[in-house]
Amino acid sequence: MARDPSTTPGSPDGHDAGGGTGAAARVVQADDERADEYAAVLGSMAAVHPDDRALVEEWADARTGTVVDAGCGPGHWTAHLAGRGIEVIGLDPVARFVAIARAAAPQVDVRRATVESTGLPDAGVGGVLSWYSLVHHEPDAVPIALAEFRRVLVPGGGLLVGCFTGPVLEPFEHAVTTAYRWPVNRLAAVLEAAGFRVDAVHRRTDEGVRPHAALVARRS
């Protein structure tokens, strides 16, 4: 889900957009149980750090064609981008998040789908925003989502990935369920192996919150 990561360590700031069985299904269930809490605390643009807002806006404004908010959660980013005149589709596997997003912005296209199976056509979108929507994915599962992102993107289409970062790839206890910190160079290597070119990396560390990074990439 697209979210503001610059929150206190105990807040429910990570939402995974996977589905299916096993670990992914447990994440979806946990998110569904806390969807209203998340939406009330973090489900608005007022909760977004100004630096993150500027980065995502600049990236999205530069896309040609539809932008997919992959793991849109309560849909605040989806609605915000639509309000800027961008053609955007919000996707989330959590039924309650989809309902909240549709109620908040009925004019915006929000669909229930996972990041591994978006239901979108091949090479049909200009950008994919994955703003903290992979943070609960087990590392071996991340390439599956990236393959789906690459499939739906036009050649040269943009991908923006937000993540928790640290010196080593490691799990940590999160308010929803286990999440992962990624070294930037390691996640960049995974993106490149999945058929993306990483063009830029943005890092931000604020006192009292988890370090995070954003990787700007494009389908190669």
Segments (PLM) and residue ranges:
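A short glycine-rich, Lys/Arg-flanked "PGG" loop and its adjoining helix->strand segment in the class I
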Residues: P143-P155
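Conserved beta-strand signature within the Rossmann-like core of class I S-adenosyl-L-methionine
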Residues: G156-C163
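A short acidic, Gly/Pro-enriched loop at the edge of an enzyme's catalytic core
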Residues: E116-V128
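A short SAM/SAH-binding and catalytic strip from SAM-dependent methyltransferases
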Residues: G127-A141
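Acceptor-substrate binding/catalytic loop of class I
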Residues: E170-R186
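Class I SAM-dependent methyltransferase SAM/SAH-binding core
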Residues: V68, P74-S117
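Core SAM-dependent methyltransferase catalytic element
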Residues: D206-S220
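Conserved class I S-adenosyl-L-methionine
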Residues: A2-R63, P167
